[in-house]
Amino acid sequence: MNAYPVTDAVTYVGADDPDLALFEGQYPVRPIGVSYNSYVITDQKIAVMDTVDARVTEAWLENLDYALDGRTPDYLIISHMEPDHAANIARLAALYPEMKLVGNAKTFVMLRQFFGPDAAPADHLVTVGEGDVLELGSHRLRFFLAPMVHWPEVMVTYEESEKLLFSADAFGRFGALSLTEKAPWAPQARRYYLNIVGKYGAQVQALLKKLASLPVEAILPLHGPVLTQEIGRCLELYDLWSSYRPEEPDRVLVAYASIYGHTKQAALALADLLTERGADVTTCDLTTTHVSDALTQAFCCGKLVLASVTYDGGLFPPMEELLNHLKAKNFQNRKIGLMENGSWAPQAARLMRARLEEMKNLTLCPTAVSIRSALNEGSRQQLQQLADELLAP
């Protein structure tokens, strides 16, 4: 059991999933896993804040039983209907048939889709809208709709007396709490945000504006730790990420996709040139780095170099995968350099340029380095030109 008090009235009852390999079936989280968070607010009336993934049902029920201490919950607040948070709604409703479910209109559409038309009696559904308040006693829950952060039915809850923000998936982080207790929040929160929520920057900006006037003493997300320190910094990072601005505008990421090492050699030669000129440079081998990590690095940097071999007349799949993910997550506002390699018909630069032109507000350097099999004097001169263009103001 890992239930613990957040405040005198709020208890954490979530559960860790340290053995999960892929979050959402695609993002590697082993060996740190993930947490599925749920909370109980105890007052004259009791509210359970969300359920958990089916993988951790029994651990959650044990924690919940401890927190309730024989009492019956009056409300289940449903922040988000994604199954890693909503899988146990029907189970909890069956255990406590008098409990009411609190959500917005879109919540209950999805509730019926997941659990059937008779998921809950109509008189057990409490529909709330923007700014509505639910009184528990001395605790007052105010609801704010957060559509597409990152599903359409999402809402966040602000507890007014203790100034607590129950933030749904916003401000979440990868990592089971038992395994990442002392880990800094930002690295895995950044990777989580950019890969899970990153497409919806405008919607996150809208939510941040709604919350701007609220004093917040703690943020209680559905993944990762409860945030009680440096909340201002967490809000600043969310504002930065959701506005598609780089955290490190002058840093250059050189991401390369190489088969036999010649494209890698050229990419590292460019990285050396840039470093010699005082640039902060990071390199990324796309054949060994998961695309979620490469994407995270790309969003951090103000400048990106893409170096790819030509493959079957097209892009080498690791580079194509990165470009697909960058487009899907709304990558923008960066300076881009291109490098290609091909032994008889290099096509990668043209194809990468075409994909990048589908994205917003990207500045492509005029020089695209074109290599025939291996670096030679001519392509080394192109590297010099590209380095000049990348570092130009």
Question: Predicted regions span which residues?
Answer:
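Metallo-beta-lactamase
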Residues: 4-8, 103-154, 200-208
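FMN-binding flavodoxin-like domain, especially the glycine-rich phosphate-binding loop
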Residues: 177-219, 223-226, 269-282, 294-393
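Conserved beta-strand hairpin/beta-sheet module of binuclear metal-dependent hydrolase folds
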Residues: 3-65, 156-159, 163-167, 263
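Short, charged N-terminal beta->alpha structural module
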Residues: 255-277
